[in-house]
């Protein structure tokens, strides 16, 4: 087996919290007095996972595929973007092994919404929920996350080449 038949990708996204926007994380609408500012629905969790997938397959990043300068993506549903990223990764000859993600937010408490985020990720990635994980952390009131100015998401994915597909 070629050692590059298995690849990892790392993704990161950050958005500011602002009044007048819905807070959507992992495709889940979360009750809060503010939401994330962005060109699309600003789902930082799904953006981090999407970026990790593109990176693992050496396909660039989310901005290359879904630029924030393109009006077609204004207000876009990040679940749709993630499913398209999955299609492109599979088209490149890879399957997804698992995803592990962390959302860093002082407020709101995300624990009640984690199972919904995991279910959405599993559905969009075509994986069982046992291969999708989301963790929520505060920043212990430190930095912009701790001051409730924004939310960060980080993700790691593992992908592997399908048998019989071209090698590096």
Swiss-Prot record:
Bound cofactor: record note? Binds 1 divalent metal cation per subunit.
Instruction: Specify the pathway.
Output: Isoprenoid biosynthesis; isopentenyl diphosphate biosynthesis via DXP pathway; isopentenyl diphosphate from 1-deoxy-D-xylulose 5-phosphate: step 4/6
Tell me which EC number(s) this protein carries.
4.6.1.12
A single GO BP annotation from the record? isopentenyl diphosphate biosynthetic process, methylerythritol 4-phosphate pathway
Q: Where does a divalent metal cation bind?
A: 13, 15, 47
Q: What's the catalysed reaction?
A: 4-CDP-2-C-methyl-D-erythritol 2-phosphate = 2-C-methyl-D-erythritol 2,4-cyclic diphosphate + CMP
Which residues bind 4-CDP-2-C-methyl-D-erythritol 2-phosphate per the record?
13-15, 39-40, 61-63, 66-70, 144, 147
Q: Which CDD domains match?
A: MECDP_synthase
Report the superkingdom from the record.
Answer: Bacteria
Record keywords, A-Z: Isoprene biosynthesis, Lyase, Metal-binding
Cofactor dependence is on: a divalent metal cation
Marked site, Transition state stabilizer, at 39, 138
Which molecular function GO terms apply here? Answer: 2-C-methyl-D-erythritol 2,4-cyclodiphosphate synthase activity; metal ion binding
Supply the HAMAP family for this chain. IspF (MF_00107)
By sequence similarity, the record places it as follows: Belongs to the IspF family.
Q: How would you summarize the oligomeric state and partners of this protein? A: Homotrimer.
Known function:
Involved in the biosynthesis of isopentenyl diphosphate (IPP) and dimethylallyl diphosphate (DMAPP), two major building blocks of isoprenoid compounds. Catalyzes the conversion of 4-diphosphocytidyl-2-C-methyl-D-erythritol 2-phosphate (CDP-ME2P) to 2-C-methyl-D-erythritol 2,4-cyclodiphosphate (ME-CPP) with a corresponding release of cytidine 5-monophosphate (CMP).
Q: Which PANTHER family match?
A: 2-C-METHYL-D-ERYTHRITOL 2,4-CYCLODIPHOSPHATE SYNTHASE, CHLOROPLASTIC
Name under which the protein is recorded: 2-C-methyl-D-erythritol 2,4-cyclodiphosphate synthase
Source species taxonomy = Bacteria, Pseudomonadati, Pseudomonadota, Betaproteobacteria, Burkholderiales
Q: Which gene encodes it?
A: ispF
């Amino acid at each position: 087996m070629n050692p590059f038949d298995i690849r990892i990708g790392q993704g990161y996204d950050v958005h500011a919290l602002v009044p007048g926007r819905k807070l959507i994380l992992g495709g889940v609408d979360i009750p809060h007095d503010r939401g994330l500012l962005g060109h699309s629905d600003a789902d930082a969790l799904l953006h981090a996972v999407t970026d990790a997938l593109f990176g693992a397959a050496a396909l660039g990043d989310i901005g290359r595929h879904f630029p924030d300068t393109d009006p077609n993506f204004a207000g876009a549903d990040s679940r749709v973007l993630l499913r398209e990223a999955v299609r492109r990764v599979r088209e490149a000859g890879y399957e997804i092994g698992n995803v592990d993600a962390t959302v860093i937010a002082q407020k709101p408490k995300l624990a009640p919404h984690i199972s919904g985020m995991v279910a959405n990720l599993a559905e969009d990635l075509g994986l069982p929920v046992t291969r999708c994980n989301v963790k929520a952390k505060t920043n212990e009131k430190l930095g912009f996350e701790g001051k409730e100015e924004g939310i960060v998401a980080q993700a790691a994915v593992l992908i592997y080449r399908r048998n019989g597909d071209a090698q590096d």
